């Protein structure tokens, strides 16, 4: 069964398993997400649910968004996201999706916006090799060759060059759910997940199952 939830990355820590082994985990505050709209094949051409997550002051939302929440009878939230789920008909508007939809041992895919690194050179951005650092060398951390000269007399598209790094949508596949703490809506994921602390993340069933 397809499952999905929005969450907020709180940070990383480490826990011990039953064998006493240290496991690095990312703590995610998952939900509660409130269903605010149901998409149907008859009306919209496909089936999906729209969920909202995170508190926000009402005056920070415009009138169309306020009306959208008022129609659902739900208080205004910060984030809105749509998910295609197999059992979307079983969910009702106003119903909450919480962290306990997942179980320990499940595999999930987590999406978020990666940390922005600003303008970076090819060594950091693309793991390029640097030149000699000794006296007399004129090639230290420069780009190097960008292409042939007379033919084709241009630099090809997608050439690895310096530029803006990070701050892009990133998905990490097949991560393990180590522990669920339902009373606090927390999910502990083995390893790291994209984005900074307090960043928005999406948790879904893995596509590699």
Swiss-Prot record:
Q: Name one GO biological process term.
A: translation
**UniProt KW keywords:** Ribonucleoprotein, Ribosomal protein, RNA-binding, rRNA-binding
Keyword RNA-binding annotated:
yes
Under the heading InterPro entries, the entry gives:
Ribosomal_uL3, Ribosomal_uL3_bac/org-type, Ribosomal_uL3_CS, Transl_B-barrel_sf
Q: Name one GO molecular function term.
A: structural constituent of ribosome
Q: Where does this protein have coiled-coil stretches?
A: none
Superkingdom is Bacteria
Query: GO cellular component annotations, sorted alphabetically?
Result: cytosolic large ribosomal subunit
* UniProt region (Disordered), positions on chain: 141-163
Q: Where are the transmembrane segments?
A: none
Keyword Zinc in annotation: no
Q: Tell me, in a sentence or two, what this protein's role is.
A: One of the primary rRNA binding proteins, it binds directly near the 3'-end of the 23S rRNA, where it nucleates assembly of the 50S subunit.
Report quaternary structure and partners.
Answer: Part of the 50S ribosomal subunit. Forms a cluster with proteins L14 and L19.
So what family is this one in? Answer: Belongs to the universal ribosomal protein uL3 family.
The record's NCBIfam families line, in alphabetical order, gives:
L3_bact
According to UniProt, the name of this protein is Large ribosomal subunit protein uL3
The scientific name of the source species is Clostridium botulinum (strain Langeland / NCTC 10281 / Type F)
Gene name as annotated? rplC
